[in-house]
Amino acid sequence: MMHICYLTGLYSRKDPLIFDRQGKALAMAGYKVTIVVCDLEPNETIDGIEFISCNYKPCSRIERMLNTKKFLYRKALMINADVYQISDPELLSLGVKLKHKGYKVVFNLREFYPGIIHDKAYLPKMARNVIAVLMEKYLKSSLKKYNAVFTVTDDTDNRLEKWGIKNHY
């Protein structure tokens, strides 16, 4: 049985996309599904989906961006799934690291992150353009290393095509 593992430090256990739409559909189709989350809740199985906690919950956005990767990476190596899926932009490097270890890794590009940086009130206005440009370059270089990228809009799909990323769906 193929084992698919979702890694997230951003989304909750019952995120509508990860748990309800993707996870349940895969479990019902006969796949083993694990969702690894950064929270302090006990491990459990719901609707055939195994939830594993990192036993770590970041207290701030900065802490989440800096620390969740190491906790999720340790759990990912222990789980040894066939495919890992990541949806968090701050985990792009984690996916690349898993890919270098020989794992299959996919990224779910839910939003075009460089485009939404301009709306982030917590970022200084003067820095948003620079951060957006850097994020776009980082996203482009990272996603080329993934086995597949899932998109939700034609605009994002077209952008990935222009970047030369062929494995997007």
Predicted regions and their residues:
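Helix-loop-beta element that forms the nucleotide-linked donor phosphate-binding surface
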Residues: 150-151, 156-169
